[in-house]
A protein has these predicted regions:
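Short, flexible loop/hinge motifs at secondary-structure junctions
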Residues: 1-192, 238, 267
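Catalytic center-proximal scaffold of phosphoryl-transfer enzymes
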Residues: 2-23, 27, 31, 42, ...
Length: 502
């Protein structure tokens, strides 16, 4: 509001205007009106100044609220994205995929097919046939018993086989006679007057390696299976496992030596508790064997304490552990993890470069499998360069799309992903140049699955020697399984002292 006065006059001018022609009272009234107008102008100016200040304050407050609103929107978007994070688009374990209406372990990167559940047409079945059972009987490894139904006659019969297991405790009496010197040559394993045989000990070690039962439950299970005849205790089971671990030292060294000479080995680590603190168990494996180690940390120094890493000169396949880049001569990255991150980026930003790169990596892997089936060891130079150019084009498109990504957190994470894909391009595409390098590190994931199960089911470790014992036992058992060797027979051989199995 602005008040305008066309004429401002002084007292002398007022007198001149009066010129004696106006009454004094009229003049006084006119002066009062002018005074009131002056007062109104001052009051109006003050109100205008106050309103201007108020408007200025409101603008500042509006800007502040706008910033807060933008931050809340960013936080809301980030939290929504976090709710959608699971094992299919991050490195979170499947066991954490708990969402309303859906069970855990129900998420992966596989796409649904139209196939029905169960056996597929053209696949070989695994039904145990009558002919296979008769072959087993002929081998002499099975006790053959005959049971009849109906009256025995010459009219003929049909045969049905029932395969069962009979658990019968055996007490073997060992008689040790004096030698020529009049002494009893008692072997070390028979120092105690009563000992458990290799079969009982092998069963206990095998159950312990599974990691789903505590020692007292293993003892209870074997006691129940023997109808109470064994009378095992928790301490007995621990003693069997400790003895097996001690006897496995030579075999572990052979496994380590074999892995050191391999061109490509896979490794990963998972968290376990040790005396209430966070610790790790790491695997080192190839297609034929695996060795486990306990670690306090995942640092470069902790890795250096494992003799394998300081002597290995091949290619390490891992899940982007930067500390591992200090060891070995070459490195391959797990691309399944990258596929998850690319899926997450597509969901959160809506940008297409990550979807295109994901499709490209899967295409390369499919074509690689076909080439391997045809006996080839690598792509042609022309094909390899084509794939590398397409990879680079996806990253260039990603950089352009990142400029227009709206949400701050998604934009920052996308930029980080693009930087990683560019910096470690050779490591992510090593499987493209060398077919002996796997596309993913799923082998290590499977190797550590038992360790994770043990942590959840039986708990962690109270002492470091307990962790070391478990790692040694698991190394032997999992290697035997991977080589499809008779598990119980070879565990018993180690107990007996003839462990030449590797």
């Amino acid at each position: 509001m602005v008040l305008c006065y066309d004429v401002f006059i002084t007292v002398e001018e007022k007198m001149a205007m009066a010129g004696g022609h106006y009454d004094q009272s009229l003049y006084d009234e006119f002066v009062k009106v002018l005074d009131r107008l002056d007062t109104m102008k001052k009051e109006t100016d003050q109100k205008i100044a106050g309103l201007n200040n108020e408007i200025s304050d409101l603008k500042k407050e509006n800007k502040k609220l706008q910033k807060e609103n933008d931050l809340l929107k960013e936080d809301n978007t980030r939290l929504k994205n976090l709710l959608n994070h699971d094992s299919s688009n991050t490195s979170k374990p499947p066991s954490s995929d708990q969402k309303p209406g859906r069970a855990a372990n129900n998420y992966n990167n596989r796409k649904k097919s139209e196939k029905k559940p169960g056996a597929q047409t053209g696949h070989k079945g695994t039904t145990l046939s009558k002919e296979k059972v008769e072959e087993k009987l002929a081998s002499g490894k099975y006790l053959h018993e005959i049971e009849t139904i109906g009256k025995v006659s010459e009219r003929g019969y049909v045969v049905r086989y029932v395969i069962d297991l009979r658990v019968q405790p055996v007490i073997r009496e060992i008689r040790i006679y004096k030698d020529a010197d009049g002494k009893y040559p008692i072997p070390e394993r028979y120092r105690s007057e009563v000992v458990y045989g290799p079969t009982v000990r092998a069963l206990a070690v095998d159950l312990y390696s599974e990691g789903v039962m505590s020692n007292d439950r293993i003892a209870a299970f074997l006691n129940d299976a023997s109808e109470g005849c064994l009378e095992l205790s928790e301490g007995s089971v621990y003693g069997f496992c400790r003895k097996f671990s001690d006897l496995s030292g030579t075999e572990i060294e052979k496994l380590e030596e074999h892995l050191t000479n391999q061109p490509v080995v896979a490794t990963d680590a998972t968290t376990v508790s040790l005396n209430g603190k966070q610790s790790y168990i790491r695997n080192i494996s190839d297609e034929k064997m695996v060795v486990y180690y306990g670690m306090e940390k995942k640092t470069k120094e902790a890795l250096g304490e494992i003799p394998f890493f300081s002597s290995y000169a091949g290619t390490l396949l891992h899940d982007h552990e930067t500390a591992l880049y200090q060891y070995g001569t070459d490195h391959a990255e797990c691309n399944v993890h990258i596929l998850r991150y690319l899926k997450k980026n597509t969901e959160e930003t809506g940008n297409q470069w990550s979807k295109e790169l994901s499709d490209l990596l899967c295409e390369i892997n499919r074509e690689r499998k076909k080439q391997k089936e045809e006996g080839k060891s690598c792509f042609s130079e022309e094909k390899r360069q084509e794939y590398e150019k397409r990879y680079a084009a996806c990253l260039e498109k990603g950089i352009e799309e990142n400029h227009s990504t709206k949400h701050k957190y998604a934009k920052r994470e996308e930029k980080t992903l693009l930087t990683r894909l560019e910096k470690y391009r050779e490591n992510h595409l090593l499987f493209l140049k060398r077919f002996e390098v796997p596309f993913d590190n799923n082998m290590s994931e499977r190797d550590l699955r038992k360790v994770k199960n043990r942590q959840k089911m039986a708990g962690g470790f109270r002492k470091e020697k307990g962790q070391k014992m478990y790692c040694r036992i698991l190394s032997i058992v999992e290697t035997l399984k991977r080589r499809k060797m008779n598990l119980m027979a070879h565990i018993k051989q180690i107990f007996i002292g003839t462990p030449a199995i590797f």
